[in-house]
Amino acid sequence: MEWLEITVRTPPEGVELVADIFQEIGTGGVVIEDPAVIFKYAGATCPEEWAVPESATADGLPRVKGYLPADGTQSKRLEELAAVLARLLPGPASAVSTRTVSEEDWANAWKKYYKPVRAGRRLVVKPSWEDYRAEEGDLVIEMDPGMAFGSGTHATTCLCLRLLEKYVRPGGTVYDVGTGSGVLAVAAARLGAGRVVAVDIDPLACRVAAGNAERNGVAGKVQVVQGNLLEKVEGRADLVVANIIADVIAAFAPEAAGALAPGGVLIASGIIEEKAGLVVCALEAAGLAVCERDEEGRWVALAARLKA
């Protein structure tokens, strides 16, 4: 299968807007290449091992990439994108380029950017094909996300991992909603959870998550379930983690609260700063009291405990 890769070069303040526009027109994935982020991680984690293509940092401007299936509808949706960009980011504020890529190229090209990242005090996420010199006390999670969401390096995932370090109870039950690659489910199991249910509506993500659980030696703890949110999950959990988007989290809050045991905690991430208030209100209305807020850039993660 072939895909149309659309690249928008934009100033930093336009990145989130362009990513939102891509989602609105129905792209099958969004990639953000931000030189500031690239250099930040390259300087923080084994800089000698990083190989950054010059094209990713040449002019210092972020690039946002979206993918549309080459199924005959891409031209119309590309026109929609151009019209919205012209209205919201006029003139030289954005520049658009396109190219056709095969699914095999898309599935493997990202690997050159994926390097080990310390995501918390103890948790380190590394790709299965990379070496990492573990420090004393490190919990190294080996991942191969394939085409599933969740390499472990995005701010929303790192925020979740930091909160998991604090809230996973030894022997407890954890539900990972929208598991993607399974990185959060695997982390919960490695942190001592006794039972983890990893849920995703995408069968590909379920296969990838199961493979990563096996790769990390926690397949006996992690049950992968294909389904929408918690509709196929029974029983209560000590912890529910959902790294999705703000509007879905807000709508999901009552269901999450109903799935928590007394004193249980919901970790919610994937929330842009502007929508954090919306999510907090939804959590409070569902009987959840926010007990911690963590931020990275414009991303927010919340930990909320079920009220007595």
Curated annotation (Swiss-Prot):
Chief place where the protein resides: cytoplasm
Record carries keyword Cytoplasm: yes
Residues that bind S-adenosyl-L-methionine: 157, 178, 200, 243
Catalytic function, reaction form: L-lysyl-[protein] + 3 S-adenosyl-L-methionine = N(6),N(6),N(6)-trimethyl-L-lysyl-[protein] + 3 S-adenosyl-L-homocysteine + 3 H(+)
Annotated localization: Cytoplasm
Keywords: Cytoplasm, Methyltransferase, S-adenosyl-L-methionine, Transferase
One term under GO cellular component: cytoplasm
Intrachain S-S bonds: none
InterPro entries from the UniProt entry: Ribosomal_L11_MeTrfase_PrmA, Ribosomal_PrmA_MeTrfase, SAM-dependent_MTases_sf
Protein's GO biological process: methylation
A GO term for molecular function: protein-lysine N-methyltransferase activity
Enzyme class: transferase
Keyword Methyltransferase listed: yes
CDD domains registered for this protein in UniProt: AdoMet_MTases
E.C. number: 2.1.1.-
Function: Methylates ribosomal protein L11.
Family: Belongs to the methyltransferase superfamily. PrmA family.
Protein name in UniProt: Ribosomal protein L11 methyltransferase
Source organism (scientific name): Pelotomaculum thermopropionicum (strain DSM 13744 / JCM 10971 / SI)
Gene, per the UniProt record: prmA
